[in-house]
Amino acid sequence: MLITYLMFNCPIIFLTYKRPNETEKILKIILNLKPKNLYVFQDGKKKGFTREENQNHKDTKSIILKYKKNYSYKSIFYKENISQSLIGYKIIKEVFKNHEKTIILEDDCVPEVGFFRYCDLMLKKFKRNKDIAHISGCNLYYGSKKKKINDKDYFFSKYPQFMGWATWRDRWQKYYDPYLKNWEKERYEFLNNKNLKIGEKRFFTHYLKRFRQKKLITWDIQWVYACIFNNFKTVLPSVNLIKNIGYYNAPTGKGAKKFRNLVTKDIKFPLKHNPNITFSRKYDNFLYEGFYNRKNIFLRVINKIRYSPITKSIKKNLSN
């Protein structure tokens, strides 16, 4: 059931592309808040679009314009396609010209209603705590295990996540580097950081190298690196407030099976505040083993092959 708000003051960015059904679903949720400052962006078409893609892009724009008849928000339509390595940077930079904080949603992330209030409260509470740079609405641990990390309504991680999130202008403008110009200078310090595990160092060395070689097109890994390099904390809700639906219908980016079918649950207010502003070892170990420990993933594949029934059968035949 949707809750009606008098006015939601925190700025919201909604990035769309060519998902008309998803765009309409999420836009309705946002508009129910009566947002005072909503910015709806649509990236331009790529060259070589199919007829279906062209129609989906056109339909998405029509939906954005349709709701403007009854609601007030700013819509920005780019005529040309912006590189995936710059789109996030460009739209956030645009909004930060006039605001000191923002909530960001993409068109494949369906939020629970409480997501917006949660982000707004966290943005206000930790505004002056410069050790915290990112607020996430996605909790992959709860989404996959249906369990909470602790008895509080939020906790802290070293890993920022982007399926519904928020941040402040001062952190973003100071630390986000869309081109990773300082990577070569910072590389030695990063690799010698005793607080980082070998898997994290291997992961970022691999993917930042690919990004610098223009073999990886993205705008978010730069912020993940900035947060980890500067030892920033991310606030996460005790439950998962975001369902990613983009992995089912022609996703913009490459999906992962583990993102599918994540359980969501709305958060209750007032929040039980967490006085312990330290990294959650349990959550960070969960993400490390699932995403950042590339060697561990490789070994799991090897072990799966090694102990498969086919492999056992071959070994048995060879020994006879």
Map each language-model feature to its residues.
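An acidic/histidine-cluster motif and surrounding catalytic segment
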Residues: 5-104, 109-320
